[in-house]
């Protein structure tokens, strides 16, 4: 995979930079967490500093046909403008014709950078038919002379702007964000100091099964929390009440428990939980994990203490998936306790994107408190499952 260090520019031709500005916004369109925009700055500023005219491409959310309201990248263009000190025009390019060349030229002559409107406004971007995606890529390709992918969070997709468009260029490279992400994953794969602890939470075991199978032989401790823990508790004969439970995966949970025992991997489950009658309950009660009556929505204080001690005794920690329903303050203490333990740890601490990265900001922590916070949710998991990311394979 070629990186920006070996990247050469075409004479005067713009460079496509596929960024990932898929950031969370509130109901009035205000960005609530701009990690992904800030993470793109090293690549953008480096290319601008080297005199390259830039055409940025990104997606935002999952707009459906003829439903564009709430999915405009305008707030992202405005936030990026604040960071780089240059006005970043937002260009609506739904009509890919010769008129666009003139508009792009005017903007690039003035600012040196533009942001195309949400690429997912084209249905072809996410089409399952490769022929459709290739048509969109062929329409886009003439507007630039080179291609840089810095959208790690979208690189597990076979979408037109990260897969087919990259194949349209011989002069292409990965940006600094992707390079940084891959270095962090390389550290986990080949340089992880021991004890090596993995914490997995989130809703479903089925979403993390392949990940667990791939990493279990390489770790010393596996801490399980979130909704997926209840399938493991049920496998051990515990009463899980109305908690999230995947009964069809209980046998898989038993296999994982047996494998951990046979390979001296310490598998640690919650010993107490915070349970409540509903997801919106204003208050939960502490219960032993083996006898839950209602819904387990967070790990309890004893489990928090156990997990904290394990983290303090670790040299490498990877965490993906919140410990509970952290969006509700009543059930955020478990996730907060893990963040607090990790932020004060001397270990290499890796936060695995998605909801886990969102919790960092929401619960008042700083991304700099951790060794690495990934910008990719699905991309992060697929790498740890041992998969090759399609968009990186074609660079």
Curated annotation (Swiss-Prot):
Keywords: ATP-binding, Cytoplasm, Glycolysis, Kinase, Nucleotide-binding, Transferase. The keyword Chaperone does not apply. Its EC number is 2.7.2.3. One of its GO terms (molecular function) is ADP binding. Signal peptide: none annotated. It catalyses: (2R)-3-phosphoglycerate + ATP = (2R)-3-phospho-glyceroyl phosphate + ADP. It is an enzyme of class 2 (transferase). Monomer. PANTHER family: PHOSPHOGLYCERATE KINASE, PHOSPHOGLYCERATE KINASE 1, CHLOROPLASTIC-RELATED. Belongs to the phosphoglycerate kinase family. This is Phosphoglycerate kinase. It comes from Tropheryma whipplei (strain TW08/27).
